[in-house]
């Protein structure tokens, strides 16, 4: 005969989702044109995912001009490659799709892990010490907003 343990059932407590996304969203989704978007991705940026995520959280759901102003004033090293990426995405939108930069809106800004560059540093007594430099992929999606 198999014996069973009686375990007291503990209900899971749901975490409250932060309201930052709702607060940061300034344009209702019905005003965003669904198929009028521009994707721009940059691969293998030599930067930690967490450092890039800190900057991307600030620019998500903002207009292009506001984003450029924020990125220029941010004191983080991660803001410069992201600024170049946003500039490039906006240039692609105006050149290839004839969008106006004043109506561009960042709907998606995400970062993902990439490869880790491994090097060795010489240490005392002929030993070596590994150095791991992490990299990341960053994707920006710009959407056009309808005039109201």
Swiss-Prot record:
GO MF annotation, one: structural constituent of ribosome
Cellular component GO terms, alphabetical: chloroplast; large ribosomal subunit
Cell compartment(s), UniProt: Plastid, Chloroplast
Location, primary (coarse class): plastid
Keyword line: Chloroplast, Plastid, Ribonucleoprotein, Ribosomal protein, RNA-binding, rRNA-binding
Function: This protein binds specifically to 23S rRNA. The globular domain of the protein is located near the polypeptide exit tunnel on the outside of the subunit, while an extended beta-hairpin is found that lines the wall of the exit tunnel in the center of the 70S ribosome.
Record note on quaternary structure: Part of the 50S ribosomal subunit.
Family to which this protein belongs: Belongs to the universal ribosomal protein uL22 family.
Matches recorded under HAMAP family: Ribosomal_uL22_B
Name used for this protein in its record: Large ribosomal subunit protein uL22c
Organism: Triticum aestivum (Wheat)
Gene: rpl22
């Amino acid at each position: 005969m198999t014996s069973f343990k009686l375990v007291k059932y503990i209900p899971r407590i749901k975490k409250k989702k932060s309201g930052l996304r709702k607060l940061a969203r300034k344009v209702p989704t019905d005003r965003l044109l669904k198929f009028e978007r521009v994707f721009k991705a940059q691969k293998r940026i030599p930067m930690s995912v967490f450092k890039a995520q800190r900057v991307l959280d600030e620019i998500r759901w903002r207009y292009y001009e506001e984003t450029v102003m924020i990125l220029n004033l941010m004191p983080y090293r991660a803001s410069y490659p992201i600024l170049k990426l946003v500039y490039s995405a906006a240039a692609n939108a105006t050149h290839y799709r004839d969008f106006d930069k004043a109506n561009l809106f960042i709907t998606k800004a995400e970062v993902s892990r990439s490869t880790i560059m491994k090097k060795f540093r010489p240490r005392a007594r002929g030993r070596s010490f590994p150095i791991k430099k992490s990299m990341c992929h960053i994707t920006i999606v710009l959407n056009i907003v309808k005039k109201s």
